[in-house]
Amino acid sequence: MGIYKYIREAWKRPKESYVRQLLWERLQQWRREPAVVRIERPTRLDRARALGYKPKQGIIVVRVRVRRGGLRKPRPKNSKKPATLGVNKITMGKSIQRIAEERAARKYPNMEVLNSYWVGEDGKHKWYEVILVDPYHPAIKADPQLNWLCTGKHRGRAFRGLTSAGKKGRGLRNKGIGAEKVRPSIRAHGRRGK
């Protein structure tokens, strides 16, 4: 069994392996850090490599902290009936992972989001690591596995739901019966929203 398989098996059930102790120590430090932090190397090397990470120039990894649970919606200032305030029990149309990807993309506007993966959570927050690629870097332009990101149509892909997490949230993992209203997009089909 190779090293990546050992790492993968340990992270499948983090509460039952050595990952539990690692997370307990790491989360204490991560809570004190800013919401978006650039890191030197991936925490989950197996997952990062599977999603396209390579240790080369033009690729960075960023750890993002996002809130857990439903939307924290501000309370309207004008008087309304409590029933119509629409503050509690509001579920976002976007997943928390997508929010993390967008925040990383805003922090690094010259880079594009390649993919992201979960690295930890506590009662209040979730942490994701986002792989970012510089589409203008010569090393990326020369890489046959990554140079597809250099074309203009992939600009701002995190904001348009074109990452893996974005496509999942838009329902594009399904096709056939039950997925009639998903394509060409959620907005296009009768503007039913998400």
Curated annotation (Swiss-Prot):
One of its GO terms (biological process) is cytoplasmic translation. Keywords: Ribonucleoprotein, Ribosomal protein. InterPro entries: Rbsml_eL15_core_dom_sf (IPR024794), Ribosomal_eL15 (IPR000439), Ribosomal_eL15_arc (IPR020926), Ribosomal_eL15_CS (IPR020925), Ribosomal_uL23/eL15/eS24_sf (IPR012678). GO terms for cellular component: cytosolic large ribosomal subunit. The keyword Ribonucleoprotein applies. Disulfide bonds: none annotated. Residues 184-194 have a biased composition (Basic residues). Pfam families: Ribosomal_L15e. NCBIfam families: PRK04243.1. This is Large ribosomal subunit protein eL15.
